Amino acid sequence: MEFKVLDKGFLRLVDILGDDYSAVKAARVSYGKGIKTPEKDKNLIFYLMEHKHETPFEHIVFTFHVKTPIFVARQWFRHRIGSFNEASLRYTELKDEFYLPDHIRKNIVEDKQKAVRVEELKLKEQALELIYNSIEDSYKVYRKLLELGVAREMARIVLPMSSYTQFYWTVNARSLMNFLNLRADSHAQWEIQQYAIKIAKIFKEKCPWTFESFLKFNYRGDILREVEL
């Protein structure tokens, strides 16, 4: 499964270990029992989620391949429970790929974590022009440094946070749900929200019972109930 995200990014499901039944079997091993009827197995998933017995969900593991701007990746890497491998700009040259937003946002005085889109056309045009010009100038300097023979590990220091990077992310379902609680929420930055929504789509398809129970009992965000998954 793969989804296009932002202007040049993507989210790709590389591998998955387990499903809803993995959590069921992990929960029932304590009693020496396994899978029963679908109805009873689904009810068990809902019981585990409602009563915060979450360790069985750690036996469902996803691996994603992500392409995203560096500023999004740095927010992503704050989620410590998971494994990351990122492309290195010390050993590879950066392609001419940058996140170019199509809108501008301003902070809300009442809530510093939220931002709203700017509708004033003149301000939007001025801000976007400054962003685009800054990115273009930075990349020109980067290429010039490489042409001069400067090492990639030094030339990269002029690159903007809008540069695209790629990484692998391996995460269990319990930690993935924590990610969705924090990033599939209007308080998170809009760009990472877009990735969180696509992750939720994959989660729903691959583990429908777990996702449904998560949305009912444990989801603390606000946008997954407002979008079509």
Curated annotation (Swiss-Prot):
Paired cysteines (S-S) = none
- Its EC top class is transferase
The terms under GO molecular function for this entry are:
flavin adenine dinucleotide binding; NADPH binding; thymidylate synthase (FAD) activity; thymidylate synthase activity
Key word Acyltransferase present: no
What InterPro entries does this protein's entry cite?
A: Thymidylate_synthase_ThyX (IPR003669), Thymidylate_synthase_ThyX_sf (IPR036098)
Q: In which pathway does it act?
A: Pyrimidine metabolism; dTTP biosynthesis
**Binding note for cofactor:** Binds 4 FAD per tetramer. Each FAD binding site is formed by three monomers.
State the EC number(s): 2.1.1.148
What positions does the record give for the motif labelled ThyX motif? 78-88
Keyword annotations: FAD, Flavoprotein, Methyltransferase, NADP, Nucleotide biosynthesis, Transferase
Question: One GO biological process from the UniProt record?
Answer: dTTP biosynthetic process
- The record places the active site at R183
Record-listed dUMP binding positions: Q75, W76, F77, R78, E86, A87, S88, L89, R90, R156, R183
The entry assigns this protein to a family as follows: Belongs to the thymidylate synthase ThyX family.
Cite the record's note on assembly.
Answer: Homotetramer.
Q: What is this protein called?
A: Flavin-dependent thymidylate synthase
Per the UniProt record, the source organism is: Thermosipho melanesiensis (strain DSM 12029 / CIP 104789 / BI429)
What phylogenetic lineage does the species belong to?
A: Bacteria, Thermotogati, Thermotogota, Thermotogae, Thermotogales
